[in-house]
Amino acid sequence: RLEQTDYMAYLVMDGGQCAGYFSYGAASHGGYKDFSFCLNSLYLLPPYQHMGLGRRIFAQVRQAARERKLDSFFCGCNVHNLPARRFYEKMGGVVGEIDDGHENLAEDQMYFEFCTGEQI
């Protein structure tokens, strides 16, 4: 990804400790519908969850999409990751498509669609 100019990746740090990571920009695992912008990953270690960090990160991603003059973006989520699904719903995500039923449950994905005009 170093050569890709529309892909941002961040480490979330707490002093010298890594608390998580997130990335956004061009979709890293293929496109979805006609969306050009994607929250590719968002992960916070359990001690850093439920502290408002995810909401702040999401606001940064939404702002980055706005700065690109986009009115929407998407993210993929494993169907079986209920905490992540609840988070994306709280952030205003609407389920667009679900691709489940795979033998390997890690391949079961759903796609959330977001508007950049919504405030969180």
Place the predicted regions along the sequence by residue.
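Acetyl-CoA-dependent GNAT
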Residues: 1-46, 58-60, 64, 101, ...
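Non-catalytic, surface-exposed connector residues within folded enzymatic/regulatory domains
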Residues: 33-36, 51-52, 106
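Conserved glycine-rich acetyl-CoA-binding loop
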Residues: 45-59, 68, 79-86, 90
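Conserved GNAT acetyl-CoA-binding A-motif
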Residues: 65-76
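Conserved beta-strand-loop-alpha-helix junction that forms the acyl-donor binding cleft
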Residues: 75-85, 101-107
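Conserved acetyl-CoA-binding loop of GNAT-fold acetyltransferases
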Residues: 89-98
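Terminal substrate-recognition subdomain of acyl/acetyltransferases
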Residues: 106-120
